[in-house]
Amino acid sequence: GVSTACLYPRLLEESVYDLAVNGINHIEIFVNTDSELKKTYVSNIADTLKRFEVSCRSLHPYTCAMEPMMFFSAYERRIADVLEYYKKYFNAMNILGAELFVFHGNKSLLQIPCELYCERFLKLYETAREFGITAAQENVSRCSSGSLSFMKEMVRNLGDKAKFVLDTKQAVRANESSFDILRTLKNHVVHVHISDHGEMGDCLQIGKGRFNIKRLLEILWEESPDCSV
């Protein structure tokens, strides 16, 4: 599939329409602001998806930058408030038919014990499950999750509730191997953001860099065949 973020800064509804009329059958929706979570707006997006027979697998929130403060500070009331706000995303996802919620989490500079991190993540995970949705941790280079060792600790603490989004460009930025991440986390990886990279940059169109995408897909098929890309 293709993310609406690929067409940023086009308005979300225009991005969805453009992808649909160009034959993209599967998309990820990147919400850019609060008004795009209103029921009438989301319902209109859902109508476009239905009209063109497009499925929406995942949703990416616009509030990632707030997650360190709202989920991982010492001020616990923030957690209750942010979980209540995130229900707006989950309600929107139910209308859209989306199943995966992409989570960035804490900044690596604001280190907290992994056990506490997992405790807070679990609150999000369980809230999402009330809506039939899976919250998945993305390997963002500037965040705690940019480290494969940290993600391994999440698996150790959370077991089957540790789900991940692998972003290949973020792995490059964190000096991690996408292949190693897949080999290590296996079917805990439920979604992949894939792009090419090489001398011209770390986020290129597929075919414009030197990344062995064929090998990545082979490993993905071996380790997590139900994963979406």
Where on the chain are the PLM-derived regions?
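N-terminal pre-domain/capping segments
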Residues: 1-94, 129, 160-163, 187
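Short acidic/polar active-site loop segments enriched in Thr and Asp
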Residues: 25, 55, 98-99, 190, ...
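H/E-rich (His + Asp/Glu) clusters that bind or coordinate divalent metals
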Residues: 209, 213-223, 227-229
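Active-site acidic/histidine proton-transfer and metal-coordination neighborhood
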Residues: 13-14, 68-163, 173
